[in-house]
């Protein structure tokens, strides 16, 4: 089943076109990796999928369907709740771990303390953080290690029960151990969530993704099952990128 359908998507900032005529379908409960050189439009694609592009001064034409319904027909709050995003640099709010995790649920109307406590516990467990920080929930989130901060941001995105999780280079600033922790977590998540991850790490894309899209200069060059993309790319530009000839 396709949870997202992208048809002839073009994205611009003013007169500068970032993506042009991109079409692809995203499979539900699968991990899709977006690869390509810096500046090719990967992150722009993510911010367009949950309409954050408009907050950043961008605009788009074409069509994005979420569960066969145009995303523009949804309220923005609903889209951003349903299609969550985690950024490259960990962005914990400058208050306690606990308040970080109840912020979004309270914004969306959940007030019951027991329910909030359950959300905190469940999301920390999903992010593999519960045993590490359960006794320190009142500690400032900014005092966590870099890897813990990123997992907290992922847990925070899960507190409002998204269906799709967008991740923009979530491991780029992390060491091997923390990267492995997050990859293991994402593989488990795909049972419950659809994941789209931008990564420069081709080995990471091969390890965890079911599908891979290669973008070059704003164009979707190739998209398909990850194993086939890496083993036998159809486009020579894909082959050259994978082999490290450029990018």
Language-model segments: residues:
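ABC ATPase NBD Q-loop/coupling interface
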Residues: 63-78, 229
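Catalytic Walker B motif of ABC-type/P-loop ATPase nucleotide-binding domains
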Residues: 165-168
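ABC ATPase "signature
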Residues: 223-224
């Amino acid at each position: 089943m396709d949870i997202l359908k992208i048809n002839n998507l073009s994205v611009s900032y003013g007169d500068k076109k970032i993506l042009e005529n991109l079409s692809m379908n995203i499979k539900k409960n699968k991990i899709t990796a977006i690869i390509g050189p810096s500046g090719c439009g990967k992150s722009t694609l993510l911010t367009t999928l949950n309409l954050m592009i408009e907050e950043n001064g961008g605009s788009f034409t074409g069509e994005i369907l979420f569960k066969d319904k145009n995303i523009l027909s949804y309220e923005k709050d609903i889209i951003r709740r349903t299609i969550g995003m985690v950024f490259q640099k960990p962005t914990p709010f400058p208050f306690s771990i606990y308040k970080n995790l109840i912020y979004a649920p309270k914004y969306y109307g959940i007030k019951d303390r027991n329910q909030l406590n359950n959300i905190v516990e469940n999301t920390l467990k999903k992010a593999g953080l519960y045993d590490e920080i359960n006794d320190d929930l009142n500690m400032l989130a900014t005092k966590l290690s870099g890897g813990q901060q990123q997992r907290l941001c992922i847990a925070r995105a899960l507190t409002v029960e998204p269906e799709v999780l967008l991740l923009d280079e979530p491991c780029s600033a992390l060491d091997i151990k923390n990267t492995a922790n997050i990859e293991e977590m994402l593989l488990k998540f795909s049972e419950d969530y659809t994941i789209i991850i931008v990564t420069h790490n081709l080995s990471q894309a091969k390890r965890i993704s079911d599908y891979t899209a290669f973008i070059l200069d704003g164009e979707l060059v190739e998209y398909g099952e990850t194993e086939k993309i890496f083993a036998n790319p159809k486009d020579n530009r894909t082959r050259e990128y994978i082999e490290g000839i450029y990018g």
